[in-house]
Every structure is written in C-alpha cells, then in structure tokens.
Amino acid sequence: QVILNDKALQVMDNVPQFMIKNLQGRSCILDVKCTLGDGRIVNAEVQKSDNDDHQRRVRYNAALLTANIAEPGDRFKAIPNVVVVFISKFDMYKSGKALYHVDRIIRENGTMVDNGFSELYVNAEVQDDSDVAKLMDIFTRHDAYDDEMFPITSKRKRLFKTTEEGVNEMCEVIE
C-alpha cells in the first residue's frame, strides 16, 4: 500500500521464491510474486549488494514473468499489467530519493506512454521523510518492533526476529 501508493490495495495471493523456468535460456527465481485485487502481477525483488546491472535484472525478470503469465492465444490486451518493485539497501540512482518511478516517455514530445509494465526502485539508504523511507527504516533498524505508523509490519518483524514461532515460519518459507 505504501510503495504503490494505494490505500485500497489488496494482495490476493503471495508466492515467495517463485521459480520461472526458461527452456531457451536463463531461468530465475523471483523473491516474491503477488497478484493484486485489480489483477496486476507484482514481482518484489530485494537486493543488498550493488554488484550487477540491476535495471537489466528488472527487465529480464519482468519479461520472464510476462511470458509465464500469458496464456497461449491470449490477445496482448489481455496480458495482465506487471509491476516490478526493486528494493535495495543502496540509492541506485544517487538522487537522494527513497522511491523512484521509471516511466516510458516518447523522447520527441515528452508524452508518457503505458505498455502495462511499471518499475519502481526503492532504497533503504535515503531517509527523505517520505512514508516509503519510514517503511524502509522499519526493515533496516534493529529495534523497530513497535512502530505506530506501521504497526502490522513492525509486529511481524518482531515475530520473525524474536520468537521461535517466527523463526519456524521463516524456515518453512525458505524450504
């Protein structure tokens, strides 16, 4: 809801470590694949290290995800919209923002065009007083267990970090 700026957002399903096989080349494992109430498919990727071309990674994952969700014979307008949210520890664009929206623009006239693909880059490095930066602080600050602005997120963090039940739940997800 915070990153996509949609208070009414509903996650209909959530699949961690979603494997996409590619018979023609490199396969990939998406960190998280979600289907939203409005039909959009979201891939959330989390990256700590800055050691690769992450924009190409986003493009590749989106292409495989789109190919994976398209049914044979589907018209292109029937393919669900795809959103990739790339969350990093570092400010990839080094412009001092916690959230970047990358849009498709016609260079010649500045018109924004929509092909059903959205990419958002979030980082935990920048504290710009936005809600996104405050949310990222919950994930990175060691003592963020009872935050008033994000009570559900901070309580889930407490569960995973400080209880046996949470550790067991995480182990099941990883397995």
For the regions a language model picked out, list residue spans one by one.
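Low-complexity, glycine/alanine/valine/leucine- and proline-rich hydrophobic stretches
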Residues: 106-115, 123-125, 135, 139-143
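Accessory alpha/beta interaction modules
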Residues: 1-118, 128-130
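Active-site/binding-pocket entry motifs
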Residues: 127-128, 163
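Short, charged alpha-helical interaction segments and adjacent helix-coil junctions
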Residues: 35, 42-47, 133-175
